[in-house]
Amino acid sequence: MDRAPAISSVEELLSVALDMERRAAARYAELARRMAEREHDALADLFTRLGRLERDHARFIERRLAGRLLPDPAGQASLESIVFDEASVLTPRAVLVAALRSEERAKALFERIAAAAQEAAVRRLAVEMAAEEAEHAERIAAAMQGLGD
């Protein structure tokens, strides 16, 4: 995705972010479960913590939007999910690489939204969201370093 979605209000941005946070929380919960099944306890713990962060972000956004009618985020922004079918090789490195790419795409999306934003409040919020995604990516990158080669 090279273009930023057209986001003209804080509510639109929060709607997109809420959808992304909910999907990420579910994705990380699934990855935590799968890593625990394979006895990769450190990764299961990492994905559990990331899932908790994403759920916390979603709850924060929900509180901020309390009672407001939200625009439908469909078509405004989408990120590829981390998708592994049962036949996929779920090596620790492969899972971490996929998770890192997902966080980097989310960061890049928010950076593009910030760069294209006409409204200062949208720009500030998108910059904050990009920074949060960067923090998630840093956690994943640190876990990759811990794997060695």
Regions found by a protein language model. Give the residues of each.
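A mid-sequence interfacial segment
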Residues: 88-128
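Alpha-helical transition-metal enzyme core signature, strongest for iron centers
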Residues: 20-28, 47-61, 99-106, 126-140
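Helix-loop segments that flank and shape redox-cofactor active sites
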Residues: 2-7, 24-48, 106-122
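Carboxylate-rich helix-loop segments that flank metal/cofactor sites and access channels
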Residues: 59-94
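Short, charged, intrinsically disordered terminal tails
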Residues: 142-149
